[in-house]
Amino acid sequence: MTDFPTLPSEFIPGDGRFGCGPSKVRPEQIQAIVDGSASVIGTSHRQPAVKNVVGSIREGLSDLFSLPEGYEIILSLGGATAFWDAATFGLIEKKSGHLSFGEFSSKFAKASKLAPWLYEPEIVTAETGDAPAPQAFEGADVIAWAHNETSTGAMVPVLRPEGSEGSLVAIDATSGAGGLPVDIKNSDVYYFSPQKCFASDGGLWLAAMSPAALERIEKINASDRFIPEFLNLQTAVDNSLKNQTYNTPAVATLLMLDNQVKWMNSNGGLDGMVARTTASSSALYNWAEAREEASPYVADAAKRSLVVGTIDFDDSIDAAVIAKILRANGILDTEPYRKLGRNQLRIGMFPAIDSTDVEKLTGAIDFILDGGFAKK
């Protein structure tokens, strides 16, 4: 067994969870599960106790995102991964266009490409660590990209590209929703999972959908296209408007999510959450730029994520050793995305994470580097 150095106490964060999903959960969210353990958990999801939680989540998210008139919060099971498949059945009419700039933004493009009932999608790519600009695609009735690419820490703004009239804008906000600025009216489907900024468990997808998106879903559902019921977006819409899900949800996840949304809204709403992630990301990137051995992986500062920070280290430093030393001291999940294969750390900076803890994390890395503990 390798002996790792013990970090000085001043460099130990108040909470050592820096993972990019699942992410840090606040104690109050766990207490919400305890409080609902007899009255909500273990009861029917078709009855008021659970339906009221779903309704509270939908109302809270509507407030958080300042939903325009006619938009609805829709939810169903399976996470964003299930939503990609559902979108190929029930959102894309004929053809989609995609921005692909990392592991997760590429997966929706792949799902569309594999769907034999759709035309070949157009895909614009960028090297990992960079991101293409939003753009229209000729003949595409859905334009899709990620607000935040979780694998690389690159973010792309949410806007309606010039010339995109008639196309639905579908934004994968899995790791960005709740921590990045957004004007929802610039998207038609802004979908996400709760295990990132919302500090809950996975297995659920939620989406802010525009009237145009709801109309498209209804139109496709009324066609002769085969749609599996579990992936039927119209089924998700119909159940969501009743504050239900098609099949049984993980009720503890709903309780955690509801508590987090209430916390967000009572602490400044989306602007307050973006202020928190901005403070954390500024602390991380400023440190990396000042440190000779380190540098932000995303070269363009405007594209650097506020919620997922990726930091490269030069060849003289073994970033994997840094992560191991941090883990041995209770600072968890700073390893890079597994498929990226880079000499780097990846740091979650979601709203529940305090910027003071990010500052302590950088101090811990300074201690490791200055002590020569991670030299190759």
From Swiss-Prot:
The keyword Plastid does not apply. Coiled coil: none annotated. Keywords: Amino-acid biosynthesis, Aminotransferase, Cytoplasm, Pyridoxal phosphate, Pyridoxine biosynthesis, Serine biosynthesis, Transferase. Catalyzes the reversible conversion of 3-phosphohydroxypyruvate to phosphoserine and of 3-hydroxy-2-oxo-4-phosphonooxybutanoate to phosphohydroxythreonine. HAMAP family: SerC_aminotrans_5. Gene3D superfamilies: Aspartate Aminotransferase, domain 1, Type I PLP-dependent aspartate aminotransferase-like (Major domain). The modification N6-(pyridoxal phosphate)lysine is found at K196. Pyridoxal 5'-phosphate binds at A80, T81, F104, T150, D172, Q195, N247, T248. It is found in: Cytoplasm. One of its GO terms (biological process) is pyridoxine biosynthetic process. It catalyses: O-phospho-L-serine + 2-oxoglutarate = 3-phosphooxypyruvate + L-glutamate; 4-(phosphooxy)-L-threonine + 2-oxoglutarate = (R)-3-hydroxy-2-oxo-4-phosphooxybutanoate + L-glutamate. Its cofactor is pyridoxal 5'-phosphate. NCBIfam families: serC_3. Its EC number is 2.6.1.52. Belongs to the class-V pyridoxal-phosphate-dependent aminotransferase family. SerC subfamily. The keyword Amino-acid biosynthesis applies. It comes from Corynebacterium glutamicum (strain R). One of its GO terms (cellular component) is cytoplasm. L-glutamate binds at R46. Pathway: Amino-acid biosynthesis; L-serine biosynthesis; L-serine from 3-phospho-D-glycerate: step 2/3; Cofactor biosynthesis; pyridoxine 5'-phosphate biosynthesis; pyridoxine 5'-phosphate from D-erythrose 4-phosphate: step 3/5. Binds 1 pyridoxal phosphate per subunit. GO terms for molecular function: alanine-glyoxylate transaminase activity; L-serine-pyruvate transaminase activity; O-phospho-L-serine:2-oxoglutarate aminotransferase activity; pyridoxal phosphate binding. It holds the Pfam family Aminotran_5. The gene is serC. InterPro entries: Aminotrans_V_dom, Pser_aminoTfrase, Pser_aminoTfrase_mycobac, PyrdxlP-dep_Trfase, PyrdxlP-dep_Trfase_major, PyrdxlP-dep_Trfase_small. This is Phosphoserine aminotransferase.
